[in-house]
Amino acid sequence: MKKTKKIIAISAGFVVVVLLLVFLYLYYNGLSDLYAHTVPTEGQIKVACVGDSITYGHGITNWPKNNYPAVLGSILGNGYHVQNFGQRGTTLQKDTDRPYTKGKPYAQSLEYGADILVFMLGTNDSTTGRWIDAEAFIADYEEIINSYKESNPDIRIILCTPACAFFDGNQNSGKTDFGIRPSIIKEIATRIRSFALAKSYELVDVYDLTQNHPEWFEADNVHPSNDGARAIAQLVADKIKNK
């Protein structure tokens, strides 16, 4: 009887250790959908980074320190409080299976009361079955941007084009991993540039930054690696500091 109990205890302990290791692996590689939110101190400039898995940091090694919003916070320094509101797999367009505006991070980003919004959505909109057309995309784009302006009329808005996506080998399908279509991402980037210009919004051209750097991406050719995340963070930091 004692031997049986000992075996059960050892087995239970082994299961706990395995589950803990799995959790740590997912968390530290940006695969857990958990957040490391902190509370800003008085006087800090609040920066909300809104986006999808590229903002969240999908696949980033040592995710808590190396996702692009975390790196951005390190670059900007103690005078800024940067919060990651990226949600993996979400779209900008509202009439899809996973619109960003239906998720908890969207509501949290509004409640955060940011002084600066860094906005990067559009990659997941490029997939078959989600993409309608550029006009529908921009209509929804303007609607969500306006929701932040309504929440804080004085908010500084910085729009980002989505990162480039790369083909690996056969291009006949027109898609890369996750069903992402590089041709549509290119069109989305063009439309966001035009929208930013027409509406006098500041722009960070992440597409332009990344289009000649496939080495900045993970094996899936969609998500920036640690190097890519750092490059994005530096570009955003330069925009924030050099208004």
Task: Give residue ranges: language-model regions.
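N-terminal secretory targeting modules
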Residues: 1-50, 54-62, 73-78, 112, ...
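Conserved SGNH/GDSL esterase-like catalytic core that processes O-acyl groups on lipids
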Residues: 45-48, 54-139
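Alpha-helical cap/lid subdomain in secreted, periplasmic
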Residues: 5-9, 101-243
